[in-house]
């Protein structure tokens, strides 16, 4: 077998598309980009969702600039421009999400369907297919109809399971003949921990001692309940698809946010143990039920009665409820032991892993190049680790029975206060993307991991959760004073030549 060499740190030379390009991958491998509804569409023509509610109620949490998704890049009006970018990239895949409140404005299908919203997605999907671009469609990318949050606190209540199923049923009915890749819920870990634990995300529930501005919540218990209902809602939808829609010939699965974890001190058994706990609490929390029908034993032991349990029927429903996994990967962290003050009033579910996470290890070594600079405090800077994508893919193959995998997000931001010229010359993004693609190619070739596609985040600059417009993630540039155009940045031109060498 050929030995593939990938650099772990700067300066990267993988930007040379003569050496690394799409022909390094199998001929059926899909390359493209990703987006989500709240971040790109704008509010025109849809019902309110919890990100509308959250960003207006807590503008300081929506971004340092108080930015929100009210208009953003207005892809509701300019979706054809999005397709033009994909066409220019020669992309063969595009991941986007359907806004639940655009097609069912009041959350429950029984309250009526918005035909104009359905027409919007029909237009987008057929436009993609005309250009030979495969749609990857996310049903839920965090933008729950506000009515369902108001009525029963959304995923905190089991009522969500049937409402989500009815919404998915409508999507399969309308779009299933054209859509062959469905993603149920984006980043299963995120809404429970960020929406109901730290309250950094919508709906913004937490214990009063965690953040006094939270309108209600319990950061120690609610994340586990929300995660449990997400798993059941996901599984119910997969079951529906398999019972009623297999004739459409598509595949369905969840999206996981992944990280890799390394010991803060690799000679210290406590750091090593903390690292293993993080893998179970971050990945196993969802992959345990999805593969074995049960939560990891370490979680059962640690969380105790705060962790819901599955009935035998539920366990069977959740177990094996995916045809493929969408894996998002951005960075890796060092783990060291940290106390878990279960009985304190400011306890959160995220403390249960008993780990503190950093980007610098015991010997003062940074894990890799700068990912994102923290304006307020440089000790909060994030650093990235391209080899982490290799480790994550290898881990999923070995621990979770060699699943079919699509990388559904991978990308890096640049500062939003750069001028247009600086933003267009985004060489840091080329470094990030090419170094991860090198390690992705390496793990496929060396470990025979079943990865069949890579979708970079993001198609264009957009509203970033918690950051507003203070960062840019796009491979194409959007001028916030005139959002009609999307211009390929250097990284977009690089990706274009990577896809079509």
Swiss-Prot record:
Disulfide links within the chain: 6-438, 14-434, 206-214
Record has Zinc as a keyword: yes
SUPFAM superfamilies associated with the record: (Trans)glycosidases
Binding site for substrate: 39, 141, 186, 330, 457, 464-465
GO BP, sorted A to Z: carbohydrate metabolic process
Tissues of expression: In vacuoles called myrosin grains of a certain class of cells, myrosin cells, distributed in the cotyledons and the axis of the embryo as well as in different organs of the growing plant.
GO molecular-function terms, A-Z: beta-glucosidase activity; metal ion binding; thioglucosidase activity
Cellular component, GO annotation: vacuole
UniProt protein name: Myrosinase MA1
Species of the source: Sinapis alba (White mustard)
